[in-house]
Amino acid sequence: MRVPIRALEGRWPGLLQQRAGRFFWPDPRTILDPGADPEKFRTAMSALEVGGTYKITGSNRHPGADRLVAENLDLTGAVIVDMGASDGSTALDFLAGLNGFGSYVLADLYLFVRHSRHRGRSYFFDQDGQWILVVGSRTLAWPATSKLVRGLFGRGARAAAAKLDARDVLLLNPRMRRLMERDPRVTAVVHDIFAPWPGPAPDLIKVANLLRRLYFSDTQILAALDTLLAALPDGGHLLVADNSRIPGMPPRAGLYRRTGGAFEAVATTENPPEIADLVARAGSGRAWTG
């Protein structure tokens, strides 16, 4: 659990920051600048907690997964859906190795946060209107786990939420935004992985670091896998990847083909993904009722 109040980097004496660096945090307001440095944007975005998880991402996180696709699939003209794409950093790595794909959709339930200012402080809210972060001139704080934070800044958060000039902030990395501007094949959509896919049938669905036992029960993960199975045509593929917390464990991935009403393993990295056993059980008819 994070310390609920942190100091902002660069706003305190340098010696203090050197001695207590772990209590300092980069300014999350960097995400308000669509032209921000991509790496600084990624770091700033990691301060946001939405849906019970922090928006932590980075580049070159799934080299094994990308290699499985390159070695086993021809994606010429393919419709690709990247579920839980976060800010699109890993999608940029994936797209760099693709030629001639048909379309690429970044799908994430939390593509936006809402931002508003009140009395010199920035308040951030998730898509459901829940207050998730406050940033002042020298500190930032998370209200979800702290009654103190809610008591100190709750009134300001309510006032900020009611302001007419509050605006939505797109949580896509500046590099991804520039790519989307010049390549109409790449788009983004708000989507819940537990809901039926509303777009054209994908040839490949990628799910990375989303369907984890860290976040969901096995029953919930199976329900999501059944939904993904239903979205794919026969012969379509599912790519699952995760970055394990096990010390020394490299990124894991598995590529699976829909064959009839189930997934068939095509290839995996040396260590299969965490939910490989659940992928094998998808299509069993079990459902999560919420």
Predicted feature locations:
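Class I S-adenosyl-L-methionine-dependent methyltransferase module
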Residues: 2-13, 19-35, 99-183, 194, ...
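Conserved class I S-adenosyl-L-methionine
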Residues: 77-87
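Conserved SAM-binding loop of SAM-dependent methyltransferases across substrates and taxa
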Residues: 87-100
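A short acidic, Gly/Pro-enriched loop at the edge of an enzyme's catalytic core
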Residues: 194-205
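A short SAM/SAH-binding and catalytic strip from SAM-dependent methyltransferases
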Residues: 203-218
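A short glycine-rich, Lys/Arg-flanked "PGG" loop and its adjoining helix->strand segment in the class I
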Residues: 220-234
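Conserved beta-strand signature within the Rossmann-like core of class I S-adenosyl-L-methionine
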Residues: 235-242
